Amino acid sequence: MLPKIFYLSLLPAALGHPHLQPRLDNGLARTPQMGWNTYNHYSCSPNETIVRSNAQALVDLGLASLGYRYVTTDCGWTVADRLSDGSLTWNETLFPEGFPALGKYLHDLDLLFGVYQDSGIKLCGSPPDNVGNYEDQDARTFASWEVDSLKYDNCYSDAATGYPNVNYEPSTSPQPRFANMSRALAAQNRSMVFQVCEWGIDFPARWAPALGHSWRIGNDIIPHWRAIYRTLNQAVPQTSFAGPGQWPDLDMLFVGNDILSIPEEQTHFSLWAILKSPLTIGAALKDDETSINDESLQILKQADIIGYNQDSLGVSASLRRRWTEEGYEVWSGPLSGGRTVAALINWRNESRDLTLDLPDIGLQYAGTVKNIWDGTTAQNVKTSYTAKVQGHGTILLELQDTTASGQYPGDTFATSTGSSTTFESIYGVTTSFRYNITVKLSEASSSSDVKIQSTASNKTITAQVSASGTEASAQIPLLAGSSNSITIVSPQSVDAITITPPNGTYFPNTAFTTIGDADTVSCGAGYCQPVGSKIGNISTNGTARAVIPATAGTKYLAIDYINNDVAFDSAWDWGSNSRNLTVSVNGNKPVRIEVPLSGQHSELFGPGKGWWDTATIGVLTEGWKDGDNDVVIGNEGGESGFTSYGPDFVGLRVL
């Protein structure tokens, strides 16, 4: 397999993989929940007419039949005080027929009844005061109302600091408060979906699956395009925790709120869906003043994309490659039936052609490539796929009948003339003379060798035929890119070739010299993998430098970094959950990449506060020469508003 973005497991072996975290398993949310919520459009000012009108619209517009069934009234439905017996009640002015009647109305439409409550002393943006222990009583109330789901928020919850509306650095973990309500709900004779809404505090992916069916990965989505990038950067280290009954919640959808352009809405919906987020509509579908526009409605009704979200395999897509300066990136993941979904995001606000190299998502060939947003289908796609995409839009693809990367069947990739067979569309992740090729012959050869010629070199390579007479192996050169070709001369016909990239050479941070403010930091045992230390304070005044021997050409670097600079307060502004990293080779123009979060432990209480968790990201670099190369890891451009500090640097592998 070619190098890709991946996350090192930092758990002790006895604790297992994140996929195997204990989870609440009551048969609900086997796929991500879908529905509608009042908050994004109506804020904390819902009423009975609004909820009923939009619920009816779910049915009338054909959304309910596609799976959008949970109808949740968010903040603003309660009154200032509980009843004399301590139980919750609704605001009779806003909901004159009451919540039990609202639930019956929804159930009669074959919809599901969702309510909202808070783990603090009052609800976000609305009463009542909740001082005391009301979880058991509230759970009984919700069960008696025949509630189907509960969104449980996190406002006014930190006693040690006087219960402020919001505290992103609480004195204790929010986990016990959510655990109390989880236990209370479990004690009822009615199963309810429990949505943990802790805003990403204390890295809930480690504890929320045991308590609820979904957890908010970060702060609220805001009505701006930049919120998409910020949210995806926070999702990166959490995708491996997704699975049946435990879903990372990227927050409600802004599709249909007349805030994003149509291509932006397509990107928003596509990525929320393939990352297996709950799909909760936040737009006004139909009320006395508003109805959703048809283009946005068709996005919400895109059946293929809903199918990816609800796929029985239940595996989230993950970030595979990012090109910051070029303004695009690739996410992909597996689907049931051996299919693959891939999203190529155009971060630039201009229409252009973009190319997906299939090996970046682990594939070499696809018999069918379905382009969802432009409605076309391509057949027999070899190595690369190119399509036009609008500014801020996404090329969303479903790939079927695929071949794994590095596998080149002759009947697909080759043409033969006499004893010569030429394979086209050969992909190289890096420029190197150390690719390993295995030639598979159709029958045993009487010859002792075959001749191999790569367009990356004018030299002919002789490969010895194995004892079986059906295979020959050698090392060959390839250039970075998808335009290589290989010609094989053999008296026997060639069935296929297999090519694997070089392992490369690893250079830990200890091989680098720190300059200026940059410094080396030791980590706890088993962390900052695979080195056990890192270089921090990388900035415009702090760099790490090493002399690295290599051959000439364009080189792929697999960079081990650490970033747990979580955007909480800054999420309301320009916080992006990313840090800026630059790599300069031999004084050439640096390659810049904004790396996402890597932390998979609590930013408050976890080992190293999440700053010991390594991730790997790939970047292609120019300017390498034969012999020694001067390599500088820095943060050029940080002073221009990217980020003041780069991520911490663990090491890199040169392929």
Swiss-Prot record:
It catalyses: Hydrolysis of terminal, non-reducing alpha-D-galactose residues in alpha-D-galactosides, including galactose oligosaccharides, galactomannans and galactolipids. InterPro entries: Aldolase_TIM, Glyco_hydro_27, Glyco_hydro_b, Glycoside_hydrolase_SF, Melibiase_C. This is Probable alpha-galactosidase D. GO terms for molecular function: alpha-galactosidase activity. The keyword Hydrolase applies. Substrate binds at E198, W199, G200, I201, D202. Residues 1-16 form the signal peptide. It comes from the Eukaryota. Glycans are attached at N47, N91, N180, N189, N349, N436, N458, N503, N537, N541, N580. The keyword Electron transport does not apply. GO terms for cellular component: extracellular region. It is an enzyme of class 3 (hydrolase). Disulfide bonds join C124-C155. It is found in: Secreted. Hydrolyzes a variety of simple alpha-D-galactoside as well as more complex molecules such as oligosaccharides and polysaccharides. One of its GO terms (biological process) is polysaccharide catabolic process. Keywords: Carbohydrate metabolism, Disulfide bond, Glycoprotein, Glycosidase, Hydrolase, Polysaccharide degradation, Secreted, Signal. It comes from Aspergillus flavus (strain ATCC 200026 / FGSC A1120 / IAM 13836 / NRRL 3357 / JCM 12722 / SRRC 167).
